């Protein structure tokens, strides 16, 4: 079984020293969902929200969140991200919005937390913008879809999950 990397021999939380690691291209993708009533989704898709373009605002929020993950999650390293991409797609057949984030860099540590934070904050932004018309929207699940680069190897969610 793998060991927790943020816990030292004394059982204390600490920031992992990555100074000896080689720089490699690292990438991670994550997804989040916001489920809502069909009327709320139609309002977003039709561009009829009085606050403006919900998808554009959520996209910017997700990008900003990825860039600031190190300020939000204790023990995360500040990273020089080379790419953050947020895709939002209405899924009317499920009354939800699917958010997928992609983060990439050339560096010494992975970008999984940045991808997860980006997708999560984009989802929270959709909730924030639409809560006046629907308070019982549901956020989730949020999950890592894939990661590549680094010594722990690649990871990809099973296509059937």
From Swiss-Prot:
Domain of life: Bacteria
Keywords, in A-Z order: Lyase, Molybdenum cofactor biosynthesis
Binding site for substrate: 75-77, 113-114
EC number(s) from the headed UniProt entry: 4.6.1.17
Pfam family, one: MoaC
Active site, per annotation: 128
Catalytic activity: (8S)-3',8-cyclo-7,8-dihydroguanosine 5'-triphosphate = cyclic pyranopterin phosphate + diphosphate
Pathway: Cofactor biosynthesis; molybdopterin biosynthesis
GO BP of this protein: Mo-molybdopterin cofactor biosynthetic process
InterPro entries, alphabetized: MoaC, MoaC_bact/euk, MoaC_sf, MoCo_biosynth_MoaA/MoaC, Mopterin_CF_biosynth-C_dom
Class of the enzyme per the UniProt entry, highest EC level: lyase
MF annotations from Gene Ontology: cyclic pyranopterin monophosphate synthase activity
UniProt similarity note: Belongs to the MoaC family.
Quaternary structure and interacting proteins, as annotated: Homohexamer; trimer of dimers.
NCBIfam families listed in its UniProt record: moaC, PRK09364.1
Protein's job: Catalyzes the conversion of (8S)-3',8-cyclo-7,8-dihydroguanosine 5'-triphosphate to cyclic pyranopterin monophosphate (cPMP).
Name of the protein this chain belongs to: Cyclic pyranopterin monophosphate synthase
Gene name of this polypeptide: moaC
């Amino acid at each position: 079984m793998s060991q927790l990397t943020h816990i030292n021999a004394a059982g204390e939380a600490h920031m992992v020293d990555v100074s000896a690691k080689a720089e490699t291209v690292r990438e991670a993708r994550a997804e989040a969902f916001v489920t809502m009533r069909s009327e709320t989704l139609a309002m977003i898709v039709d561009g009829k929200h009085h606050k403006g373009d919900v998808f554009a605002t959520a996209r910017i929020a997700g990008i900003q969140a990825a860039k600031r993950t190190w300020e939000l999650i204790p023990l995360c390293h500040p990273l020089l991200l080379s790419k953050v991409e947020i895709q939002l797609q209405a899924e009317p057949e499920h009354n939800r919005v699917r958010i997928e984030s992609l983060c990439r860099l050339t560096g010494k540590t992975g970008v999984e937390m940045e991808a997860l934070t980006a997708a999560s904050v984009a989802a929270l932004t959709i909730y924030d913008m639409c809560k006046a018309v629907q308070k019982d929207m549901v956020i989730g699940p949020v999950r890592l879809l894939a990661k590549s680069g680094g010594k722990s190897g690649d990871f990809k969610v099973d296509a059937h999950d």
